[in-house]
Amino acid sequence: MMITLTGHTLTVEEMKRLLLEGEGVTACPTSMQKVAECREVVEKIVEDGKVVYGITTGFGKFSDVLIQKDDVKALQHNLIQSHACGIGDPFPEEVSRGMLILRANTMLKGVSGVRPLVVNMLLEFVNRKIHPVVPQQGSLGASGDLAPLSHLALVLLGEGEVFYKGKRVHAMVALTEEGLEPIELEAKEGLALINGTQAMTAQGVLSYIEAEATAYQAELIASMTIEGLQGIIDAFDENVHKARGYKEQVDVASRIRDILHDSKLTTKQGELRVQDAYSLRCIPQVHGASWQVLNYVKEKLEIEMNAATDNPLIFDGGEKVISGGNFHGQPIAFAMDFLKVGMAELANISERRIERLVNPQLNDLPPFLSPEPGLQSGAMIMQYAAASLVSENKTLAHPASVDSIPSSANQEDHVSMGTIASRHAHQIIQNVRRVLSIEMICAMQAAEYRGIENMSTVTKSFYHQGRQQVPSIKNDRIFSTDIENIAHWLKTNYSIKERLDVNAAL
């Protein structure tokens, strides 16, 4: 099944299918017609010798340098090569694939001035699964993601490297095997390819998809912990949460009630104790607040995915060619910093639940869930690992968006650092998943002490799936492997491709 790009209607759900399920893309014919019409404007500007930034001038501080007609093609090639200054490890393939898709989508708005050939080449790369090797570091987030997108543009020219059929190869190797010819960029096309926010946005979309799945998983794992600690179910009563009024909080409480509806391990208020600690009692309030963050982030991503972030932009059949600043990544920088905080908090509260599962002063379970306390340490150091991860997250959660540094001889004197924010958000999500993996290992062990037969239908099913990944703790062993196995399972096999539907599990 192909997803049609229009420049206006792309959604996160469609990106999930494109990035994680390998679906292909096609261009809306009406949108392609707009691309062709806009291109005619650019060619007339070049033919008439008009002075228009980015078309017949240099770039950045060189915007006052007029480029002769015969040098326009050389200008495009020089731009791409000189701006390909990315450094560090490459983005995941899903991100570079996302960059191709988002760049094509923004061009289909018909205000960038590229030839339809350029859009078609981007789509060919997507559909043939030729993904540029794009270094993660080197972007200031304004003028957009210049360095990362230059590495994307290189491969269209037959330069640079790509991921192709499971290997990292020179771009020409993939082009030759697929029977594709590299393109030669013409006026405006180099700038149209690299002036935008598609690196931070593509990474942001992947981060959001993983964060959404992780947030659902956090509720299921927290529910297992509630059982392991014989938590008080009254705290999740609908009346409590409707009295506050936040929809996300109400929804979390509702899902946890559904998960635990037939559990024999939860207790009533006053049965064992009057109230639970905040890390149990306030799950809906805390997790619900993280869902508020996720909803905000999704909204901003879907706007940016369909945004014209090029410069200059061409309107009204060429009557207006305007230099603006839509390449500035501040909206995504803020959204990614917000995502970092919202996800880090899920790990913070999870680590506190881990402590309550392993600390003998806080429960009636064996110390550190050890089969032979003293002789065997059990889950003692797993809590250390979780504490380390949440502390690392606190450092990564420092906002990148409050930083700025001038560039291009002070012409570009304020930047967003949105790509740094987006990269750090993804790192935090990996850490959160590992903390939740530790909580799950501890919660499964606690459930065994309480009696698996007493678990709810949903948590019992989840327990058995988890036990297919890691065995019960009968003796001390290398727990690092267990943590990574659960984390890998949560990411790839449980609900990364489709969000957890609790009701379907009931």
From Swiss-Prot:
Matching entries from Pfam families are given as:
Lyase_aromatic
Q: Which GO terms describe its cellular component?
A: cytoplasm
Q: Which SUPFAM superfamilies match?
A: L-aspartase-like
- Output one GO MF annotation: histidine ammonia-lyase activity
Residues annotated as carrying 2,3-didehydroalanine (Ser) in the record are S143
Q: Which CDD domains match?
A: PAL-HAL (cd00332)
Q: Which GO terms describe its biological process?
A: L-histidine catabolic process to glutamate and formamide; L-histidine catabolic process to glutamate and formate
- How is the protein altered post-translationally, as described in the entry? Contains an active site 4-methylidene-imidazol-5-one (MIO), which is formed autocatalytically by cyclization and dehydration of residues Ala-Ser-Gly.
Biological pathway: Amino-acid degradation; L-histidine degradation into L-glutamate; N-formimidoyl-L-glutamate from L-histidine: step 1/3
Q: Identify the keywords attached in UniProt to this record, alphabetized.
A: Cytoplasm, Histidine metabolism, Lyase
Query: What EC number is given for this enzyme?
Result: 4.3.1.3
Tell me where the cross-link 5-imidazolinone (Ala-Gly) is found: A142-G144
Locations listed in the record:
Cytoplasm
Name the reaction it catalyses: L-histidine = trans-urocanate + NH4(+)
> Which Gene3D superfamilies has this protein been placed in?
Fumarase/aspartase (Central domain), Fumarase/aspartase (N-terminal domain)
Tell me its family. Belongs to the PAL/histidase family.
- This chain's protein is named Histidine ammonia-lyase
